[in-house]
Amino acid sequence: MDKYDDLGLEASKFIEDLNMYEASKDGLFRVDKGAGNNPEFEETRRVFATKMAKIHLQQQQQQQLLQEEALPRAGRSPVNGGNRQGASGKLAADGAAKPPLAVPTVAPGLATTTAAAQPSYPSQEQRIRPSAHGARPGSQNCGSREGPVSSQRPALHGLSPSCEDPSCLTHGDYYDNFSLASPQWGDKPEGCPSVSLGVGSGWPGCPGNDSTLPKSCGDHHPYQPQLSTVCSGRSFESGISGQDGGIGGHSSEKPTGLWSTASSQRVNLGFSSMGLENGTSAQPKGTTVSAPMVPSSASQGACPKRDSGLGYEASGRVFKPLVDTQPWLQDGPKSYLSVSAPLSSTAGKDSTQPGMTTGLDPKFGCVESGTSPKPSPTSNVHPVMSTPSELSCKESSPSWSTDSSLEPVLPGSPTPSRVRLPCQTLAPGPELGPSTAELKLEALTQRLEREMDAHPKADYFGSCVKCSKGVFGAGQACQAMGDLYHDACFTCAACSRKLRGKAFYFVNGKVFCEEDFLYSGFQQSADRCFLCGHLIMDMILQALGKSYHPGCFRCVICNECLDGVPFTVDSENKIYCVRDYHKVLAPKCAACGLPILPPEGSDETIRVVSMDRDYHVECYHCEDCGLELNDEDGHRCYPLEDHLFCHSCHVKRLEKGPSPAPLHQHHF
């Protein structure tokens, strides 16, 4: 426990360096960009990994010394064939609590399992050796003896071959290899050679567990130099070949144990995982192959396999709880699951090995051929937390593998086949369609986009006074009476014809075309002519704030129509043309008595006003000398007795005699 406390202290120091991680709102973790390049953090992680590797190596060396001392005692004292569950469980717990050791030598006829990181593998003759003695009849009591076999190997063998130094591992990979070190338990009778698949733990099976066929218990086989106990004869032995990271060192599994009787196989559910190892026999009975499977906490599943040519039968149970293996290894024996497994009597006949399921989904237990399974009446399950996953069932193939380089081949099978390791699949949830609000919003957005594309903002004139919508483009705009309309909105209120470019009448807030206005009964609201007093039903002429018929608007002198012609009126509102106005109303010259008219080509008249009299410009001069009079010096007018004189002439008139009338001097 002191060693584990030291590891806990080292781990707590390492966790303190992780305070740079920042918790995000979505529940995940994100790291600061600068923290990933922190040399202090990288140095701490490297030092921590190096220390952990050294501590782990020291533990392995100490356990190797203890193992070497225990091996001779285990070889000299084989266990007799008594059904002692407590003692065997204790041995299994002691063996599993220690990290595994690699065994350099293997007895003939025994199963051999090598870690995935080791470069060398046993040959086909060592891995698959049919018994030369053949099948021997044995007693039923021999199979009921429990034989837990434990083998240990260094956990460093589970590392990748390209990275033997634990300090080069990442944080997650190092803990996977350290905490999930898997011991190898394996021992075979001479007549029951087995094949190690190199992926996960192996279950070497012997066809001697058929309770209906007698087996021989008289033969003993050489013991493997490990902590092992094997019953004499053809007992159904238990063996576990653990490999951590069978493929690249990433897959780690913990030791498991199989307790079998002559008519049943009992599986301890407290184990964390069970791998796969195929056991073959020279008898034509068949071969029991354990297949990987992960049941739920209260369920188990099995899938028997059958080879049509050789009569091989495969079944498997794999349990992967999410708990550590050390507490239950120290608590003593657990309850087990007993499942009967009858074998076929001939090689050509279909044989099945049942898979017992308790509250399991049908996909976790399937039988491909043969009879229905018969579970044993004694079935005890030790509850553990586990994660269910699917079991892949493949037909006509007793070979199970995940890597072509580590794929073993059973005797007699033409080609090896692959099987997918159990994995937990996440089913995608149902896709939810858009809601009603989202559909409406999308429709409005598309409509707005279409309007903006069809009508650029540069052609926007304003809002129509009739429909209150925007007016885009000069071709749709129509302006009348100071208001803006759409071309389609400015129509006659009676016939709905467009009035753009046509005469229209605006009556009582409504717009009418000329025809509808004349013949639709709106005459009572029409204007009357100022001259004749009749209603204006046709064209109207407005002048001086009054309405006229165009034919009524004429000059009172010449009677010519003044529509579109300049005109003027007098004080009595009589209409004159400009020419007649000047003739009739033009002022008359006080000298000659003629009217003062504007010159030709002009509407303006030029006149001289003196003594409240009007004169032509040429008529305004001295009556005696004829000097043109004006405002200049020497040309000023000096009237005398209503006559126009210059200054000299005026003096002369005064010297001759006084005039009875007063003289008035005007200056212009």
From Swiss-Prot:
Keywords: Cell junction, Cytoplasm, LIM domain, Metal-binding, Nucleus, Phosphoprotein, Repeat, Repressor, RNA-mediated gene silencing, Transcription, Transcription regulation, Tumor suppressor, Zinc. It is found in: Cytoplasm; Nucleus; Cytoplasm, P-body; Cell junction, Adherens junction. Pfam families: LIM. GO terms for biological process: cell migration; cytoskeleton organization; miRNA-mediated gene silencing by inhibition of translation; miRNA-mediated post-transcriptional gene silencing; negative regulation of canonical Wnt signaling pathway; negative regulation of DNA-templated transcription; negative regulation of hippo signaling; negative regulation of osteoblast differentiation. It comes from the Eukaryota. InterPro entries: Ajuba-like, Ajuba-like_LIM1, Ajuba-like_LIM2, Ajuba-like_LIM3, Znf_LIM. Residues 111-125, 138-153, 278-300, 340-356, 369-405 have a biased composition (Polar residues). The keyword Repeat applies. Residues 181-256 are annotated as: Interaction with EGLN1/PHD2. SUPFAM superfamilies: Glucocorticoid receptor-like (DNA-binding domain). One of its GO terms (molecular function) is transcription corepressor activity. Residues 396-434 are annotated as: Interaction with RB1. Its main location: cytoplasm. Interacts with SQSTM1 and RB1. Interacts with EIF4E, AGO1, AGO2, DCP2, DDX6, LATS1, LATS2, EGLN1/PHD2, EGLN2/PHD1 and EGLN3/PHD3. Interacts (via LIM zinc-binding 2) with VHL. Found in a complex composed of LIMD1, VHL, EGLN1/PHD2, ELOB and CUL2. Interacts (via LIM domains) with SNAI1 (via SNAG domain), SNAI2/SLUG (via SNAG domain) and SCRT1 (via SNAG domain). Found in a complex with TRAF6, PRKCZ and SQSTM1. Interacts (via LIM domains) with TRAF6. This is LIM domain-containing protein 1. It comes from Mus musculus (Mouse).
